Amino acid sequence: VCVSSIPDSSKIIVVTGQRGSQIRDVKNFRAMIVSFFESLLFEKNPSEYTLIHGCCNGADLMAAQIASDLGLTVIGIPADWTRYGRAAGPIRNRLMLEYKPFIVAAFHEDIKSSKGTKNTVVTALEMDLVVWVSWKNKNPSGSLKDSEGL
């Protein structure tokens, strides 16, 4: 999606998460993302909100489809692997966070072993952004103010 103007940061959600090939229980993983959006947008107008994601198969594209179905504007920011090589992921992650979202949502079944999702979460925390993390065998943590062993 091409954007003609910068969205209001108080209405921006950044999503990061696990790659599709690594998700063990797709049905429950998708349900977790749906539940997040339903809770976050309860009694709000979804069309006023923008989702920014990193265009990765898995959590990013699941969240993008769910957000689109709910009526949010969806913006994908892909990593430029050809231009930046291995640095492309972290560069893309920082670009997403520079929109200063009101929340960064991370969906991962094992975030401590993650590279990309963990990089986004740690960078967001360093930027003093609100981060919501959900992963298997741990309740959603709400707003994180420390890296919780990430």
What positions do the PLM features span?
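Acidic/glycine-enriched connector segments
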Residues: 2-144
